Amino acid sequence: APLDGVPFHAAGPLKRWLLASDELAPGAGVFIALHEFSDVPPEERAYCRPHRHDHDEINVFHTTSRLEVEVLLGEEKVVVEAPATVLIPAGTPHAANVRSGSGVMVAILLDGRYRATDGAGPGKSRKSAGTSIPARER
């Protein structure tokens, strides 16, 4: 199902689909959204504001060509080149914004509903955030 009106995310420059949630399948226990990026213009790349969740989130980035995304994890920014996976522990302020290219991100929130709060401040994560190779610090 198309997914619009996600808190802390601007309407453009991508297409979003809701793949799984407690609303679609009661008791699913996960919220899975597919984000499709296609050569996003520079003025629309910062579409996601820092936010946090009370549950862990996993972001999987994939492309058939090239996709580079800047990911904020707490106070650290990393540049992720697809294919890559990012673990975002509960309570960690985070945001993901396209730098260049085209591809998809599958956001898997380990909660059946999308719930987020403002990501200002350092957060209260109990675990370490992490990225898979390939990634490089900005």
Task: Name what the model sees in each region.
Residues 43-59, 73-75:
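A short beta-loop-beta micro-motif enriched in histidine and acidic residues
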Residues 1-2, 99-138:
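Double-stranded beta-helix
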Residues 58-82, 119-121:
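A short beta-strand-loop-beta hairpin characteristic of the jelly-roll/cupin
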Residues 31-36, 58-61, 87, 106-109:
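Ordered hydrophobic segments in well-structured contexts
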Residues 1-48, 135-138:
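A short, N-terminal "cap"/entry segment at the start of jelly-roll beta-barrel domains
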Residues 30, 54-56, 67:
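A generic structural signal for short beta-strands and their flanking turns/coil linkers
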Residues 80-100:
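Conserved metal-binding segment of the jelly-roll/cupin
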Residues 50, 62-63, 98:
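Non-cytosolic beta-sheet module surface loops
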